[in-house]
Amino acid sequence: MQINLNDVKIEPSWKEVLKDEFLSENFARIKENFLKAKSAGVVYPPSGLIFNAFNLTPFHDVKVVILGQDPYHGANQAMGLSFSVPSGVRVPPSLVNIYKEIYADLGIKEPNSGDLTKWAKQGVLLLNSTLSVSAGAANSHASFGWQGFTDAVIRKISENLQNVVFMLWGNPAKAKAPLIDASKHLILEAAHPSPLARGAFFGCRHFSKANIYLAKHGKTPIEWDLNTKI
Protein backbone atom coordinates (compact mmCIF):
# COMPACT_ATOMS: atom_id res chain seq x y z
CA MET A 1 0.00 0.00 0.00
CA GLN A 2 1.50 3.33 -1.12
CA ILE A 3 2.44 5.98 1.44
CA ASN A 4 0.74 9.39 1.41
CA LEU A 5 3.58 11.91 0.99
CA ASN A 6 1.76 14.34 3.29
CA ASP A 7 2.24 11.83 6.11
CA VAL A 8 6.04 11.86 5.78
CA LYS A 9 7.51 14.33 8.29
CA ILE A 10 10.92 15.23 6.86
CA GLU A 11 12.75 18.40 5.85
CA PRO A 12 11.21 19.64 2.54
CA SER A 13 14.32 19.41 0.33
CA TRP A 14 14.72 15.74 1.27
CA LYS A 15 11.03 15.04 0.70
CA GLU A 16 11.42 16.35 -2.85
CA VAL A 17 14.67 14.49 -3.57
CA LEU A 18 13.41 11.21 -2.08
CA LYS A 19 9.83 11.47 -3.33
CA ASP A 20 10.10 8.33 -5.49
CA GLU A 21 11.56 6.39 -2.56
CA PHE A 22 8.73 7.39 -0.24
CA LEU A 23 6.20 6.31 -2.87
CA SER A 24 7.95 2.98 -3.51
CA GLU A 25 6.86 -0.50 -2.44
CA ASN A 26 10.06 -0.75 -0.42
CA PHE A 27 9.12 2.20 1.78
CA ALA A 28 5.60 0.83 2.28
CA ARG A 29 7.27 -2.38 3.49
CA ILE A 30 9.57 -0.42 5.82
CA LYS A 31 6.56 1.32 7.35
CA GLU A 32 4.68 -1.96 7.79
CA ASN A 33 7.68 -3.65 9.43
CA PHE A 34 8.32 -0.62 11.64
CA LEU A 35 4.73 -0.43 12.89
CA LYS A 36 4.75 -4.17 13.67
CA ALA A 37 7.98 -3.79 15.66
CA LYS A 38 6.58 -0.77 17.49
CA SER A 39 3.42 -2.62 18.49
CA ALA A 40 5.55 -5.53 19.75
CA GLY A 41 7.90 -3.47 21.95
CA VAL A 42 10.12 -0.42 22.35
CA VAL A 43 11.77 0.92 19.19
CA TYR A 44 14.64 3.44 18.99
CA PRO A 45 15.06 6.26 18.19
CA PRO A 46 11.71 7.85 19.14
CA SER A 47 9.53 8.20 16.02
CA GLY A 48 10.04 11.97 15.85
CA LEU A 49 13.81 11.48 15.56
CA ILE A 50 13.90 8.79 12.84
CA PHE A 51 14.69 11.45 10.21
CA ASN A 52 16.67 13.74 12.54
CA ALA A 53 19.80 13.57 10.35
CA PHE A 54 17.81 14.84 7.36
CA ASN A 55 15.97 17.51 9.33
CA LEU A 56 19.21 18.98 10.70
CA THR A 57 21.11 18.79 7.39
CA PRO A 58 19.03 19.88 4.35
CA PHE A 59 19.95 18.18 1.07
CA HIS A 60 21.81 21.06 -0.57
CA ASP A 61 23.79 21.75 2.64
CA VAL A 62 25.43 18.30 2.72
CA LYS A 63 29.24 18.56 2.71
CA VAL A 64 30.25 15.39 4.56
CA VAL A 65 28.52 12.03 5.03
CA ILE A 66 29.52 9.85 8.01
CA LEU A 67 27.92 6.45 7.60
CA GLY A 68 26.97 4.32 10.58
CA GLN A 69 25.15 0.98 10.77
CA ASP A 70 22.07 1.06 12.98
CA PRO A 71 20.94 3.17 15.95
CA TYR A 72 22.11 2.55 19.51
CA HIS A 73 19.71 0.06 21.11
CA GLY A 74 20.01 1.21 24.75
CA ALA A 75 17.56 3.53 26.50
CA ASN A 76 17.99 7.28 25.86
CA GLN A 77 20.91 6.81 23.43
CA ALA A 78 19.63 6.91 19.84
CA MET A 79 18.81 10.37 18.50
CA GLY A 80 18.66 9.78 14.74
CA LEU A 81 22.29 10.78 14.11
CA SER A 82 24.96 8.14 13.51
CA PHE A 83 27.40 7.79 16.45
CA SER A 84 25.67 10.62 18.40
CA VAL A 85 24.02 10.45 21.83
CA PRO A 86 22.16 13.20 23.70
CA SER A 87 24.06 15.43 26.13
CA GLY A 88 24.23 13.87 29.58
CA VAL A 89 24.41 10.32 28.21
CA ARG A 90 27.71 8.48 28.59
CA VAL A 91 29.80 8.80 25.41
CA PRO A 92 29.85 5.35 23.69
CA PRO A 93 33.22 3.64 23.02
CA SER A 94 33.19 4.21 19.23
CA LEU A 95 32.59 7.93 19.70
CA VAL A 96 35.33 8.09 22.36
CA ASN A 97 37.70 6.75 19.69
CA ILE A 98 36.42 9.27 17.12
CA TYR A 99 37.18 12.04 19.61
CA LYS A 100 40.67 10.60 20.22
CA GLU A 101 41.36 10.62 16.48
CA ILE A 102 40.16 14.23 16.16
CA TYR A 103 42.53 15.17 19.00
CA ALA A 104 45.45 13.37 17.33
CA ASP A 105 44.53 14.83 13.92
CA LEU A 106 43.62 18.41 14.80
CA GLY A 107 44.60 18.91 18.45
CA ILE A 108 40.97 19.44 19.46
CA LYS A 109 40.26 18.53 23.09
CA GLU A 110 37.77 15.71 23.62
CA PRO A 111 34.36 17.15 24.58
CA ASN A 112 32.28 15.90 27.51
CA SER A 113 29.13 15.53 25.41
CA GLY A 114 28.36 12.92 22.74
CA ASP A 115 25.83 15.18 21.01
CA LEU A 116 26.96 15.73 17.39
CA THR A 117 24.15 18.15 16.47
CA LYS A 118 26.72 20.91 15.87
CA TRP A 119 28.32 18.85 13.09
CA ALA A 120 24.92 18.12 11.54
CA LYS A 121 24.02 21.82 11.45
CA GLN A 122 27.24 22.52 9.51
CA GLY A 123 26.48 20.02 6.75
CA VAL A 124 27.66 16.69 8.17
CA LEU A 125 24.98 14.11 7.35
CA LEU A 126 25.19 11.57 10.17
CA LEU A 127 23.48 8.71 8.37
CA ASN A 128 22.85 5.20 9.65
CA SER A 129 22.26 2.48 7.03
CA THR A 130 19.29 1.27 9.08
CA LEU A 131 17.21 3.98 10.74
CA SER A 132 15.49 2.04 13.53
CA VAL A 133 16.16 -0.77 16.01
CA SER A 134 14.28 -2.69 18.71
CA ALA A 135 15.39 -2.09 22.31
CA GLY A 136 18.30 -4.30 23.30
CA ALA A 137 18.56 -6.00 19.91
CA ALA A 138 21.33 -4.71 17.62
CA ASN A 139 20.60 -5.01 13.88
CA SER A 140 17.06 -6.22 14.62
CA HIS A 141 15.61 -4.04 11.82
CA ALA A 142 18.31 -4.84 9.24
CA SER A 143 15.82 -6.75 7.08
CA PHE A 144 13.11 -4.05 7.16
CA GLY A 145 14.17 -2.44 3.87
CA TRP A 146 15.98 0.58 5.32
CA GLN A 147 19.20 -0.28 3.44
CA GLY A 148 17.47 0.19 0.10
CA PHE A 149 16.22 3.57 1.29
CA THR A 150 19.57 4.81 2.62
CA ASP A 151 21.40 3.46 -0.45
CA ALA A 152 19.10 5.72 -2.47
CA VAL A 153 20.07 8.64 -0.20
CA ILE A 154 23.76 8.02 -0.95
CA ARG A 155 23.06 7.73 -4.68
CA LYS A 156 21.03 10.97 -4.73
CA ILE A 157 23.83 12.85 -2.99
CA SER A 158 26.41 11.40 -5.38
CA GLU A 159 24.36 12.20 -8.48
CA ASN A 160 23.06 15.66 -7.59
CA LEU A 161 25.75 17.28 -5.45
CA GLN A 162 29.43 18.06 -6.02
CA ASN A 163 32.53 17.60 -3.88
CA VAL A 164 31.01 15.82 -0.89
CA VAL A 165 33.28 13.89 1.50
CA PHE A 166 32.10 10.35 2.32
CA MET A 167 33.64 8.78 5.43
CA LEU A 168 33.22 5.00 5.24
CA TRP A 169 34.33 3.23 8.43
CA GLY A 170 34.29 -0.56 8.64
CA ASN A 171 33.38 -3.14 6.01
CA PRO A 172 29.59 -2.55 5.86
CA ALA A 173 30.21 1.17 5.20
CA LYS A 174 33.02 0.48 2.71
CA ALA A 175 30.59 -1.74 0.78
CA LYS A 176 28.68 1.45 -0.12
CA ALA A 177 31.60 2.89 -2.11
CA PRO A 178 30.23 1.67 -5.50
CA LEU A 179 27.18 3.93 -4.96
CA ILE A 180 29.45 7.01 -5.00
CA ASP A 181 30.98 8.72 -8.04
CA ALA A 182 34.63 9.02 -6.99
CA SER A 183 35.35 11.39 -9.89
CA LYS A 184 33.42 14.21 -8.21
CA HIS A 185 33.46 13.29 -4.52
CA LEU A 186 36.09 12.27 -1.95
CA ILE A 187 35.77 8.77 -0.49
CA LEU A 188 37.71 8.24 2.75
CA GLU A 189 37.87 4.67 4.07
CA ALA A 190 39.09 3.36 7.43
CA ALA A 191 38.50 0.61 9.96
CA HIS A 192 35.50 1.10 12.25
CA PRO A 193 36.20 3.25 15.34
CA SER A 194 34.82 0.49 17.58
CA PRO A 195 37.31 -0.88 20.16
CA LEU A 196 36.68 -4.27 18.49
CA ALA A 197 38.78 -3.02 15.54
CA ARG A 198 41.77 -2.90 17.94
CA GLY A 199 42.78 0.65 17.13
CA ALA A 200 42.97 0.23 13.34
CA PHE A 201 40.87 3.41 12.97
CA PHE A 202 43.56 5.58 14.53
CA GLY A 203 45.78 7.58 12.21
CA CYS A 204 43.19 7.89 9.41
CA ARG A 205 43.21 11.72 9.73
CA HIS A 206 39.85 11.90 7.98
CA PHE A 207 38.83 15.13 9.68
CA SER A 208 41.76 17.20 8.45
CA LYS A 209 41.59 15.52 5.02
CA ALA A 210 37.90 16.45 4.75
CA ASN A 211 38.56 20.09 5.59
CA ILE A 212 41.47 20.36 3.16
CA TYR A 213 39.24 18.95 0.40
CA LEU A 214 36.30 21.23 1.24
CA ALA A 215 38.50 24.33 1.31
CA LYS A 216 40.10 23.35 -1.99
CA HIS A 217 36.62 23.26 -3.55
CA GLY A 218 35.51 26.61 -2.13
CA LYS A 219 33.45 25.26 0.78
CA THR A 220 33.66 26.34 4.40
CA PRO A 221 35.53 23.65 6.38
CA ILE A 222 33.76 21.88 9.26
CA GLU A 223 34.39 23.13 12.79
CA TRP A 224 34.92 19.72 14.39
CA ASP A 225 35.41 21.26 17.85
CA LEU A 226 32.29 20.49 19.88
CA ASN A 227 33.56 22.50 22.85
CA THR A 228 32.59 25.77 21.14
CA LYS A 229 29.20 27.04 20.06
CA ILE A 230 28.40 27.42 16.32
Swiss-Prot record:
Its main location: cytoplasm. Coiled coil: none annotated. It is an enzyme of class 3 (hydrolase). Transmembrane segments: none annotated. It catalyses: Hydrolyzes single-stranded DNA or mismatched double-stranded DNA and polynucleotides, releasing free uracil. Keywords: Cytoplasm, DNA damage, DNA repair, Hydrolase. One of its GO terms (cellular component) is cytoplasm. The active site is at 70 (proton acceptor). GO terms for molecular function: uracil DNA N-glycosylase activity. It is found in: Cytoplasm. Pfam families: UDG. PROSITE patterns: U_DNA_GLYCOSYLASE. Its EC number is 3.2.2.27. HAMAP family: UDG. Belongs to the uracil-DNA glycosylase (UDG) superfamily. UNG family. Excises uracil residues from the DNA which can arise as a result of misincorporation of dUMP residues by DNA polymerase or due to deamination of cytosine. This is Uracil-DNA glycosylase. The gene is ung.
